UniProtKB/Swiss-Prot annotation:
Residues 410-633, 1041-1274 form the ABC transporter domain. The gene is ABCC4. ATP-dependent transporter of the ATP-binding cassette (ABC) family that actively extrudes physiological compounds and xenobiotics from cells. Transports a range of endogenous molecules that have a key role in cellular communication and signaling, including cyclic nucleotides such as cyclic AMP (cAMP) and cyclic GMP (cGMP), bile acids, steroid conjugates, urate, and prostaglandins. Mediates the ATP-dependent efflux of glutathione conjugates such as leukotriene C4 (LTC4) and leukotriene B4 (LTB4) too. Widely expressed, with particularly high levels in prostate, but is barely detectable in liver. sinusoidal membrane of hepatocytes. Belongs to the ABC transporter superfamily. ABCC family. Conjugate transporter (TC 3.A.1.208) subfamily. It comes from the Eukaryota. Glycans are attached at N746, N754. It comes from Homo sapiens (Human). ATP 1 binds at G445, P446, V447, G448, A449, G450, K451, S452. Disulfide bonds: none annotated. This is ATP-binding cassette sub-family C member 4.
Amino acid sequence: MLPVYQEVKPNPLQDANLCSRVFFWWLNPLFKIGHKRRLEEDDMYSVLPEDRSQHLGEELQGFWDKEVLRAENDAQKPSLTRAIIKCYWKSYLVLGIFTLIEESAKVIQPIFLGKIINYFENYDPMDSVALNTAYAYATVLTFCTLILAILHHLYFYHVQCAGMRLRVAMCHMIYRKALRLSNMAMGKTTTGQIVNLLSNDVNKFDQVTVFLHFLWAGPLQAIAVTALLWMEIGISCLAGMAVLIILLPLQSCFGKLFSSLRSKTATFTDARIRTMNEVITGIRIIKMYAWEKSFSNLITNLRKKEISKILRSSCLRGMNLASFFSASKIIVFVTFTTYVLLGSVITASRVFVAVTLYGAVRLTVTLFFPSAIERVSEAIVSIRRIQTFLLLDEISQRNRQLPSDGKKMVHVQDFTAFWDKASETPTLQGLSFTVRPGELLAVVGPVGAGKSSLLSAVLGELAPSHGLVSVHGRIAYVSQQPWVFSGTLRSNILFGKKYEKERYEKVIKACALKKDLQLLEDGDLTVIGDRGTTLSGGQKARVNLARAVYQDADIYLLDDPLSAVDAEVSRHLFELCICQILHEKITILVTHQLQYLKAASQILILKDGKMVQKGTYTEFLKSGIDFGSLLKKDNEESEQPPVPGTPTLRNRTFSESSVWSQQSSRPSLKDGALESQDTENVPVTLSEENRSEGKVGFQAYKNYFRAGAHWIVFIFLILLNTAAQVAYVLQDWWLSYWANKQSMLNVTVNGGGNVTEKLDLNWYLGIYSGLTVATVLFGIARSLLVFYVLVNSSQTLHNKMFESILKAPVLFFDRNPIGRILNRFSKDIGHLDDLLPLTFLDFIQTLLQVVGVVSVAVAVIPWIAIPLVPLGIIFIFLRRYFLETSRDVKRLESTTRSPVFSHLSSSLQGLWTIRAYKAEERCQELFDAHQDLHSEAWFLFLTTSRWFAVRLDAICAMFVIIVAFGSLILAKTLDAGQVGLALSYALTLMGMFQWCVRQSAEVENMMISVERVIEYTDLEKEAPWEYQKRPPPAWPHEGVIIFDNVNFMYSPGGPLVLKHLTALIKSQEKVGIVGRTGAGKSSLISALFRLSEPEGKIWIDKILTTEIGLHDLRKKMSIIPQEPVLFTGTMRKNLDPFNEHTDEELWNALQEVQLKETIEDLPGKMDTELAESGSNFSVGQRQLVCLARAILRKNQILIIDEATANVDPRTDELIQKKIREKFAHCTVLTIAHRLNTIIDSDKIMVLDSGRLKEYDEPYVLLQNKESLFYKMVQQLGKAEAAALTETAKQVYFKRNYPHIGHTDHMVTNTSNGQPSTLTIFETAL
């Protein structure tokens, strides 16, 4: 497997000195690089040794294993929370010291503020001692400010690192578990859920560690502040504290509500992403069936449910933020109202000491403490989900490969097993056989007989309920549905083994890959995409076989690898690979190609999980056993087979084989892009994920807001925000004005003037109450409105993006891996739903507060404006300088995240293969390497933001110093109330200013998600689904197809895959399309369905296909695809997504394809929910469902795209027979590799390198010994060629000379005039 990245730069933090660590100077070189050019992956610093994924994962895994053991001994349920606490409590507890010092400094600050204001209240210009003392107080105040600036960021840096470590360790454990899941456990989870654990649930750990310490710091600080307030204003402080205490349960109640909404939302999100995954996976089929609208409705409904929950949780969040915004105002209001009503007199120093003390405790108690509760409750939900996953059954290590101790063999004795413990009928029953080195055991049987299950039993994937399986020797396994992972072709074959040129060349040759590698530009160093997009199914199958052969194992389990390739290659693989290279090995081959049975040492015939017959080929012939009847399903009527056949399924999904039958679900981020293109020589290059550079454009903001509401709403929103902020400042100003009036009065009174004036309490209190109520109301209104608009915007953009994806051409899906598209729908939409509205509102609130603070300071001491200018310039430069680097870091973090998910989903698809090859450890290492790469980016993301924040707080500290010392210098001109207002505001600026700027950068970073979504709302579109010009409803009633000089390519400027094709297909004609892999057979279908726009003209019943809408065209043709695709949902939805048919019609269609009984046995019959991708049906059964769809559509044109490759001959025969019966009056095009499928066609179309080489009746073509078709038939061997020629001849005479009686349907073996048994079961091939 590929190394993920080269050795990176050593981390400068390791050698940094104390000063450098405190001020993050060690990051300066990185910022310089970021300023000069765009940052790339190799600019990132390597992960610190203690942060490596493997180290962290194994450490936590150790504690979890101990916890599981402890729980088993005490007969309890193990607790993941306990394991986490045991692992991390020491290192995390130390960080509490930071919190303690920081929160103490916040409490000390107001005391010294009070002393400074006191100096102003008792101002005496002659008292120099008082002035010096005041300067001393100002110095202590600034010292506290600086300590806060430094400590705060060190604390945050360390707790965020702790969160990262916990997340990385947890991901390591989840992946490790995924590799060990038993098949029963696989039924209880889905790929979507596991990806969700990895993308959403573990992110809660990053957040919970930040706030956790405030669970004890909050209450402690509240007690200290109460004590200080009591000394300052006496009993009135209890009124304020009471309000604070009332707010807390309110907030925790919000928290609980929020967490329950969160888990409900998560269920809907899971369902939406799972369905999205299926849509992207099966997009080709959805387009060919013209089912986009049905899926659009499905996703829209899921999204509506999700959004309604999101809106409700957003309202809660809005209320929460609003209460935070106005909490301090309400508290101060209640405190001073009580204070005044109790008859006390307010003074400036008391007012502002109280305001500042409340300010300190307010942050902790109303923001950090509830956040801690909310995050802890969210984390608990996530830990529960992860714990449930970690406790799923693991695969038993019982009959994993035993040491070969010299004797190598596979021995199965009286083996019985169930996939589903609840089911009554066993999957396999009473099997016994032994295979020794040098033997080839062929396993045959009808669809669903248990052939793949037998292999899984040998692999140890299917645990016995009775009997035993002993395997001596190393296993190599080739799955029925080929699995490749992202990496080079060579790394896919080597799969961790050392490269030995000679052996490698030999394997490449035996697996018929030599020619393919020559066609690829980079040969075996070509990088295969996420789903093997650059390879055709046939190539993938051969790469899988090559991987197995190169392993040089003792035992080979081959699950029908020959059906994915054409006859010639199939023979090459069988003779050179299976019979030669593997001739000394133990080989078990599941196959439907009965012509190879002669070479088998033993043949095992399975039916309904039981062994019907076992013996050698000659024994079978002697006993006169009719293979044909053995391979029949019981409910088939016995009749002489016509000449059926099996086109092959070249490109299959990556998932485990049809064995997962009767399971409720299984991994399925699969290669749904049925590359119906013959990508053999049309490499589709995977485009690099875009990382747009530089600033997020103004256009993105405009589109984002316009998606949310009308511009009038926006003007209203701006006014509302301004009103809220003005009310906020006025409330404080009024208090300082009142205190000033009171102190002037006191001075007058003390000065011995007339004691006639008394302040009108009602007037001052009335205005004060009015301003407080206004602040609260405006705050709530603005919060709710912002959330409503932004969530609405997210909904609109999601719908636009989804619509755009549905209308995108197939090429888009070939160029973009599933993970990348899904990332837009999961991560980016998650940001738009959840984080962006919150961050945005937070940013607006803090921005307005910062503006308020500066305005007040300038109003009080106008000359402050002078030093503000350079500070402002430094700030603007700093922000620009920081964002240049931080944007790149954030983008790198996004792009290094994708491979983690891709690797997980790819591993889940190839789970059996990985386990068979014992490659779990290698995959785990690769996963850890992907995680480390992501950690490098994440670590920079954390540290760069701290670097910036420390510098911002330095600017604020300067501002506080200027205000404090400036007011002392100008003491003559100022009164106490003004100084109190300016200084208390300046102190709040400390944390708030850097938070505001960071939130502005955060908003900009999150706008990247908006950009990414908007980018997908404007994709290149296919032609419209419907035009004004609609074809007549009965069109096409004839089914005549004319190709007139058709050229076809998959991408503009790409190579032509069809060249100057001209052909006429008459009404009701049956046409077989043949050619080597890569000849353009599937491209012909793509051109017909306009999956890409063809050049030239294609007419169907005198209507030009390019002149009508795509849906009008595609709905009128039925296709039975190579790849049987079923979707989650009911069987009814799968057959008839638009509810166009009655129940009777649906049951009849199922009866026709002999699935009626199977469906009737399901608990909900036709309304039973299918598992993810229909995995509770075997591949053969899924193919029959596709046939039922075609029967229901009753179209005049049917296209069969190699549809019966991995079904047994009998099912194949059933499909062929139904096609003959049901579609006798239709035009049928069949792409085939197996020539006997199409030998009885009216015409054969032979394609080669995209050109039409021959087009005539099969018998006519066979008369010409120079024809390509003749050569193809001859390659099958004499007996087969003779049989095919005879069939073609009979069909030819029957069609052209019906008066000559050709009744003899039986092909006779010329040697003895007897019907040949071989021919009987070969006809099915």
